[in-house]
Design a protein with these regions (language model features):
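Short glycine/serine/threonine-biased micro-segments
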Residues: 20, 46, 93
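Compositionally biased, intrinsically disordered low-complexity segments
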Residues: 15, 44-45, 117
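Short N-terminal micro-motifs specific to bacterial/archaeal maturation
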Residues: 2, 18, 42-43, 98
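Residue-level detector of alpha-helix boundaries and kinks
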Residues: 11-12, 37, 41, 84
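A beta-strand edge to alpha-helix "cap/lid" segment located at domain peripheries
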Residues: 2-3, 57-133
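Secondary-structure boundary/capping motif
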Residues: 9, 32, 49, 53, ...
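A solvent-exposed, acidic/Ser-Thr-rich amphipathic alpha-helical stretch
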Residues: 5, 24-26, 30-77
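Short, low-complexity N-terminal intrinsically disordered segments enriched in polar/charged residues
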Residues: 1-29, 33, 128-133
Length: 133
């Protein structure tokens, strides 16, 4: 049987590989230099590959445990929405990654939305801890 991920756009396939393996070193090759990252816990968009990679690396550590999984996806020509669920300290987190990519298949937009409020609060705490290391 064919792997359904093989039919996904290259940027989304690569993101799935990173999310699944936790290989944060692969972010540099995947992110566009002018990528914009929008976090559910930071008011302003974060612009540029270095800062986006920092936030995404922390998110992979915080969210990417054994409980993390994508449960649905909607894919368009240059963007996708990936719904995920995970568990942190007994709190169920439900979120959506909205990802855009350029003609070179580099991610140029990454927005994370999370619910419920308890999830945002624990995510804020854990991200602050991860970013301070």
């Amino acid at each position: 049987m064919d792997d359904p991920k093989q039919t996904l756009p290259a940027a989304i396939r690569k993101w799935h590989e990173i999310a699944q393996t936790g290989d944060r070193s692969a972010l540099d090759a995947l992110l566009a230099p002018d990528v914009v990252f929008e976090s559910p816990v930071v008011h302003t968009p974060q612009r540029g590959k270095a800062i986006a990679a920092t936030y995404l690396s922390a998110a992979i550590v915080v969210l990417g445990g054994a409980e993390f999984r994508y449960v649905a996806e909607w894919v368009g020509p240059k963007s996708a929405a990936l719904e995920f669920v995970t568990l942190i300290d007994g709190i169920e987190i439900n979120g959506v990654d909205i990802i855009g990519w350029n003609a070179d298949d580099h991610i140029d937009r990454f927005k994370v939305m999370v619910r419920p409020l308890k999830a945002i609060q624990i995510l804020h705490q854990k991200m602050a801890e991860a970013l301070s290391r």
